[in-house]
């Protein structure tokens, strides 16, 4: 079970986009995450009519290391660390370390 999952709202801790929030689009097996609107770079693409790719300058999100993001806690309006807790019914859930509040029900 991963501490950061697809669809989570995260905040960036370091780098050029420090303090920005975004939604996780994808968690990569290399320990990196793609976050919507974070670490956007411009790529120059050649047109490829066989694949239907138009040429030009394309803005694209690049992966960020998972250690550089923190799960956003709406109650405190800050990034928060995540831990795990086993509930009485045997389910393992993620909890915020600062408050003990369950992240996913």
UniProtKB/Swiss-Prot annotation:
Highest rank taxon of the organism: Bacteria
CDD domains recorded: KOW_RPL26
Entry keyword set: Ribonucleoprotein, Ribosomal protein, RNA-binding, rRNA-binding
GO MF annotation terms: rRNA binding; structural constituent of ribosome
Example GO BP: translation
Ribosomal protein as UniProt keyword: yes
Gene Ontology, cellular component aspect: ribonucleoprotein complex; ribosome
Ribosomal protein keyword on record: yes
Classification via SMART domains: KOW
Subunit record text: Part of the 50S ribosomal subunit.
Its job: One of two assembly initiator proteins, it binds directly to the 5'-end of the 23S rRNA, where it nucleates assembly of the 50S subunit.
Assigned protein family: Belongs to the universal ribosomal protein uL24 family.
Protein name: Large ribosomal subunit protein uL24
């Amino acid at each position: 079970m991963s501490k950061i999952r697809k669809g989570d709202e995260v905040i960036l801790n370091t780098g050029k986009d420090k303090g920005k929030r975004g939604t996780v689009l994808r968690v990569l097996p290399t320990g990196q995450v793609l976050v919507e609107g974070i670490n956007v770079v411009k790529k120059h693409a050649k047109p490829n009519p066989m694949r239907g790719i138009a040429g030009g300058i394309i803005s694209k999100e690049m992966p960020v290391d998972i250690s550089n993001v923190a799960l956003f806690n709406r109650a405190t309006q800050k990034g928060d660390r995540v831990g795990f807790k086993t509930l009485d019914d045997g389910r393992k859930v993620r909890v915020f370390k600062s408050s003990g509040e369950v992240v996913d029900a």
